[in-house]
Design a protein with these regions (language model features):
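Charged docking surfaces used in two-component/phosphorelay signaling
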Residues: 54-58
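C-terminal output helix
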Residues: 144-153, 157, 165
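Acidic, metal-coordinating helix/loop segments flanking the phosphotransfer/catalytic sites
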Residues: 68-86
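Receiver (REC) domain active-site loop signature in two-component systems and cognate sites
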Residues: 93
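Conserved acidic carboxylate
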Residues: 47
Length: 245
């Protein structure tokens, strides 16, 4: 990660110093969640302040394929087009704010699995409650350091990796009690939409195992999404491609 100078624009709203924990951050490594294009995980930054957007983009360019948008509407379209591994969004933006963006991403089965970190200029309990109510996974109050954001992103992606590990081992449990327990853990960790998605595609595959018509095109049509979107969602939730699943 690049050590960029924190933009002056972020200091205007706070007089509190930035707390850096260099020892902790130095030991963190990003999970390698491959993408279809670059082999890097995809980070979508939705931020209308050009300085802040540039600061985050340059800080993570070495470890992520970085996408940017200047408002929630642009961010939503980027998310639908590319299905990023994680979204970092400001709250106060023109056209569509970050709360609305988060809500719409979490309510769309194509993007409901994507972790969202919201950035806010004020440490307001009301703002945080509203964000968590629409499915935000984490919050950061400006000003923040790139290393702190890195830690949040890393933790969210590591949590997803652990869930994937649970998912991949549930088919070979020691006994039925273990299988039931693992399924409960997975179900509790996923949203309602993502649980319904897994149940639907599992049923589709099981019902058509002997059919010649079952392929990526058939499954993507039945799941009402493109083949590439289905691939990325399956990889994000299970660690397996559609064919492997």
């Amino acid at each position: 990660m690049t050590d960029n100078i924190y933009p002056n624009a972020l200091h205007a709203d706070s007089t509190e110093p930035i707390q850096e924990d260099t020892n902790q951050e130095a030991s963190l490594e990003y999970p390698q969640e491959a993408t279809l294009d670059t082999g890097k995980p995809i980070l979508l930054i939705v931020e209308d302040n050009e300085e802040i957007q540039k600061y985050i983009s340059e800080s993570f360019a070495d470890s992520f394929e970085v996408l940017t948008a200047y408002n929630g509407e642009e961010g939503k379209q980027q998310a639908l087009n590319r299905i990023p591994d994680i979204v970092v969004s400001d709250i106060m933006m023109p056209v569509m704010d970050g709360i609305t963006l988060c809500r719409q991403l979490k309510e769309d089965v194509q993007t409901s699995h994507i972790p969202v970190i919201l950035l806010t200029a004020k440490d307001s309990l009301q703002d945080k409650e509203e964000g968590y109510e629409v499915g935000a996974d984490s919050y950061l109050t400006k000003p923040f350091s790139a290393s702190l954001l890195r830690s949040r992103i890393n933790n969210l992606l590591e949590s997803r990796k652990k869930l994937i590990a649970q998912f991949q081992t549930q088919s070979v449990p020691d006994n039925q009690a273990d299988l039931k327990e693992k399924r409960i853990v997975i179900a509790e960790a996923l949203s309602k939409l993502d649980n319904e998605f897994i149940e639907k595609i599992t049923l589709l595959i099981e019902e058509n195992l002997s059919s010649e018509k079952i392929d990526i095109t058939y499954l993507s049509d039945k799941m009402c999404m493109s083949g590439s979107t289905l691939y990325r969602k399956m990889k994000a939730l299970t660690g397996l491609s559609t064919n492997e699943y």
